[in-house]
Amino acid sequence: MKEYKLENIRNFSIIAHIDHGKSTIADRLLESTSTVEQREMREQLLDSMDLERERGITIKAHPVTMYYNYNGEVYQLNLIDTPGHVDFSYEVSRSLAACEGALLIVDAAQGVQAQSLANVYLALERDLEIIPILNKIDLPAANPEKIRKQIEDYIGLDTTHAIACSAKTGEGISEILEAIINLIPPPTPPQETELKALIFDSHYDPYVGIMVYVRVISGEIKKGDRITFMATKGSAFEVLGVGAFLPEATLIEGSLRAGQVGYFIANLKKVKDVKIGDTVTTVKHPAKVPLDGFKEINPVVFAGIYPIDSSDFDTLKDALSRLQLNDSALTIEQESSHSLGFGFRCGFLGLLHLEIVFERIIREFDLDIIATAPSVIYKVVLKNGKTLLIDNPTAYPDPSIIEHMEEPWVHVNIITPQEYLSSIMNLCLDKRGVCLKTEMLDQHRLVLSYDLPLNEIVSDFNDKLKSVTKGYGSFDYRLGDYRKGAIIKLEILINDEPVDAFSCLVHRDKAEARGRSICEKLVDVIPQQLFKIPIQAAINKKVIARETIRALSKNVTAKCYGGDITRKRKLWEKQKKGKKRMKEFGKVSIPNTAFIEVLKID
């Protein structure tokens, strides 16, 4: 690394809604600072996963150090790229805590969107210097002045220093680099000499083990130091090496000092040992108080993941363990289902997190898997005063001992064009939402604030919102509190046998509609047998919906040519008795497609 001057360091992040050009601007900055040679350049360089490139999103935070000559001085610019999605908001808040400034990228044609709003508020809470960037000015629909006014009116940011640019053509990129140097302050000189470093991410490398990404606040960290983690009060570890992101992770001689961003490797075995937001200090001269803001990340959404072929169980176990090495928020617990066999109960930060894990298992490990319907954590308050936390219908206790149920609610902000207001209000009403306020964002768009049950969000809220707003609506949410709710267990019985994989916890008002739609779907996907099969939806043993798969009919009187009707009746009676016995002892085989089809039900 080049000469160290604290006043020449700039640590910044990029805040943007999905598809507003964050990764492309990062590419242009890397090009302009010659961090990456032209022949090695490719689109979305910091997005290392194929999934990130395809979806146009950032899943893991990717830091990079750039050097830029300006007015005869060399400046060290540390970009800490952050995930943009609401599922990863804690990671975003820790990445922002490692910075002094942020670039707010807004599409000059689309304007401010919900997820960029959420992250701007996180940056404002940290008192960061925010530079608005109006991207995509090369588009015919771009209206930078209108978007500038939108940022001033709704977010309350001064847009005097806003920069209009086009990441596609490279226009305005040098102005962005100059603004980073002139407007974002350097790190504050440390008041203490003891090591304090903020962990903002970690990564498992098969060759060197766990790489811990840090921003050094005070002191320095170097090879040979014995360090410990303050919030989790873990064991002591020896630092085996320190490095920087140039842009690839590269080991360096010397140390990481106050204000710098880099990583260290130690003899750490699991990512779970490293908590994002924790403070690193030395054993010899420990810091007195840790950095504030640390909290444990707990999963919010749960789902069962099962292999379609039961012989793939060990491969699935290995796949999940490997994913967990790089994803400390993913929780795994072995479980078994009467219908699906052995699998895993997994916890996720949100629906996008679930989708990403599901997709990575299929792609990277070539496995065929089934995921059960996503569920949230409910509180069950029992009559004896105890409280249970359940995320699985199989853990639902006997209804006679339940005092009441509580479900998690979230605060939701929806940004939409005005003409879709009534459609969104109907959608939120259908999802049991409570309207808090409606504000104008500009002449054409509104911000709606709602309280909604989390269970309604994790099912299909995003798809329905995109559908009713023709793709123009966006939303973000943050966890609120628990509230009483009439949550009940809906059981599905096939041939009078309950099938646990189809059971779910639903609100009483929606139970009948949900039960009916599952029964109707199963009638279409379960093949006919020689006996009729009843499919029932039941609550507490009371059937609320029923469909019947008709028996395959076999013509037992085909050999009777004319003749006496009593002969035919005797054969029909014998057939009826046989079918009755088959119904008692016959097993209904449920195809895998049935489980997948039920998951598709809204």
UniProtKB/Swiss-Prot annotation:
GO molecular function per UniProt: GTP binding; GTPase activity; ribosome binding; translation elongation factor activity
Membrane topology: Peripheral membrane protein
Broad class of enzyme this protein falls into: hydrolase
Keyword Hydrolase: yes
Residues that, per the record, bind GTP: 19-24, 135-138
Domain named tr-type G: residues: 7-188
Family: Belongs to the TRAFAC class translation factor GTPase superfamily. Classic translation factor GTPase family. LepA subfamily.
Task of the protein: Required for accurate and efficient protein synthesis under certain stress conditions. May act as a fidelity factor of the translation reaction, by catalyzing a one-codon backward translocation of tRNAs on improperly translocated ribosomes. Back-translocation proceeds from a post-translocation (POST) complex to a pre-translocation (PRE) complex, thus giving elongation factor G a second chance to translocate the tRNAs correctly. Binds to ribosomes in a GTP-dependent manner.
Protein name: Elongation factor 4
Organism in which the protein naturally occurs: Chlamydia felis (strain Fe/C-56)
Lineage: Bacteria, Pseudomonadati, Chlamydiota, Chlamydiia, Chlamydiales
Gene name tied to this protein: lepA
